[in-house]
Amino acid sequence: MLGTIGVLLAALFFGAIGMTAMFRPHNLLKDFGIETAAVDSRNEVRGIYGGFPIAVSGLLLFSLTRPDLSNGILFALAACSAGMAIGRIISAIVDRHLGKIPLLWGMLEVIVAFLIASNITAR
């Protein structure tokens, strides 16, 4: 059981995604063939790929300080990470294709879901 280390690694993962989206939005999506040349597209990247992961990272860190709230926080965030991976699987089935980059991100999302879930305790 990875416990606290797993939560810290997951917080680092989401924090890095969020900060990259905030300050280098074009870097985050270029490997997927998505352009962020328009101002509105960068706003979208910063909002969704920046703001959400930064909030997730903050909640993961907060969960380490509040054992009374941690199980709910960790369960919800593990489900979010797993949900992203499930979305990739559904996309691969519908499109009959899964590229190397989406596969890599999907594997990372599954690993992160397990890292987060490893700190959920029975009560």
Model-inferred region functions:
Residues I17-T20, R24, I34, A92-G106, ...:
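Anionic, Ser/Thr-rich low-complexity intrinsically disordered regions
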Residues G18-M19, L60-L61, R88-I89, F114-A117:
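Alpha-helical transmembrane segments of multipass membrane proteins
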Residues R24-R42:
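Cytosolic, membrane-interface loops and tails of multi-pass inner-membrane proteins
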Residues S41-G47, L104-A117:
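Small-residue-rich segments of transmembrane alpha-helices in multi-pass membrane proteins
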Residues R42-L64, A79-C80:
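Core segments of alpha-helical transmembrane spans in multipass integral membrane proteins
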Residues S63-L103:
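Transmembrane helix-loop-helix
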Residues A117-R123:
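Juxtamembrane boundary at the C-terminal end of a transmembrane helix
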